[in-house]
Amino acid sequence: MTTDTHTLHIEEILELLPHRYPFLLVDRVLDFEEGRFLRAVKNVSVNEPFFQGHFPGKPIFPGVLILEAMAQATGILAFKSVGKLEPGELYYFAGIDEARFKRPVVPGDQMIMEVTFEKTRRGLTRFKGVASVDGKVVCEATMMCARSREA
């Protein structure tokens, strides 16, 4: 457990998110402010299983997984802001608008994801997400997420 309340290491992330290898896409939280924003990192390794087929000889991190990594970051922000999931609750990726991919992400890149809380309405929370590598935007999107009891 860290002593700095604005960073989270993998052990703390595993306590918050239900995701596990190979689908856990957040390695560390660099900074956050409850109810406002969170900045996290995904270290992109050539050992990721999807690189075998995406694409042979020219590995590119799938854009849909960039979006998933940002969605996982919203989950961490939500759980740090309003509490962890209770038994029987799920946190859903409910929608996406204005997704744009600006440049490819490749093995060896360190992808920084910043998600910002925008608003909650009718059980949906809207976040703005931006992913970057070396200070250059690789993806941006508006994401909607919902927290609810299992059906």
Swiss-Prot record:
UniProt-annotated catalytic positions: 54
Source domain of life: Bacteria
Alphabetically ordered keywords of this record: Cytoplasm, Lipid A biosynthesis, Lipid biosynthesis, Lipid metabolism, Lyase
Keyword Lipid metabolism: yes
Molecular function as annotated in GO: (3R)-hydroxyacyl-[acyl-carrier-protein] dehydratase activity
SUPFAM superfamilies, A to Z: Thioesterase/thiol ester dehydrase-isomerase (SSF54637)
Reaction catalyzed: a (3R)-hydroxyacyl-[ACP] = a (2E)-enoyl-[ACP] + H2O
Single biological process term from Gene Ontology: lipid A biosynthetic process
Intracellular or extracellular location(s): Cytoplasm
Keyword Glycosyltransferase: no
Family annotation (CDD domains): FabZ
Family: Belongs to the thioester dehydratase family. FabZ subfamily.
Function: Involved in unsaturated fatty acids biosynthesis. Catalyzes the dehydration of short chain beta-hydroxyacyl-ACPs and long chain saturated and unsaturated beta-hydroxyacyl-ACPs.
NCBIfam families noted in UniProt: fabZ (TIGR01750), PRK00006.1 (NF000582)
Protein name: 3-hydroxyacyl-[acyl-carrier-protein] dehydratase FabZ
Organism of origin: Enterobacter sp. (strain 638)
Name of the encoding gene: fabZ
